[in-house]
A protein has these predicted regions:
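Short, Lys/Arg-enriched N-terminal segments with co-localized hydrophobic residues
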Residues: 1-10
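Gly/Pro-rich cap/lid or specificity-loop segments adjacent to the active site
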Residues: 13-170
Length: 170
């Protein structure tokens, strides 16, 4: 399923049941460089976890920023741990931050034909400031003007703090 974003970006959605959870996988196209929104786009992957028993309830969202940097979000293999507890009150959104997991990766191929300065410049697009811009784009397009809760672990805690500093009303 494809949807148009508010800003013209495309969102792909795949929804399925796993264990006692309803999983919705999203792929969002966002600018590599937010100063050049018409330029190159990258894909940001996010997975929504919703307990099957709450499928028809309007639960608020909780976005989770993973630690690292450089690690993808956790993959739910069972209805347990912090995800189980959080999913009792929220739709949990697990974000693969830019360059990680199922989002557009950073790999050796990313740097083919680049000199050291070009590589350093390219990597600046994968910092916390752009990770939180991605999250805000996703929030605006997924839940519009509604607010969500934010949780982060390790580097993800830094991203959560950064997000709350830049988007305190989100």
């Amino acid at each position: 399923i494809k949807y148009k974003f508010n800003y013209g970006y495309i969102m792909e959605v795949n929804r399925y049941k796993y264990s006692e959870m309803i999983i919705t996988d999203y792929n969002f196209l966002v600018p590599l460089d937010y100063e050049n929104e018409d330029g190159e786009k990258i894909s940001i992957f996010a997975r929504e976890i919703l307990r099957e028993e709450y499928e028809n309830k309007h639960l608020p969202y909780l976005i989770f920023f993973q630690g690292g940097p450089g690690y993808e979000s956790p993959r739910p293999i069972a209805d347990s741990g912090w995800i189980k507890r959080a999913s009792e009150e929220y739709r949990v959104l697990l974000l693969d931050q830019r360059g990680t997991g199922l989002s557009t990766p950073i790999s050796g191929e990313s740097f083919l034909g680049m000199n050291d300065n070009d590589i350093a410049s390219y990597l600046t697009f994968f910092r916390a400031d752009n990770i939180v811009r991605d999250a805000e784009q996703i929030r605006e397009n997924l839940i519009k003007d509604n607010k969500w809760s934010v949780l982060g672990q390790s580097f993800g805690g830094f991203c959560a703090t950064h997000y709350l500093s830049f988007y305190p009303d989100s």
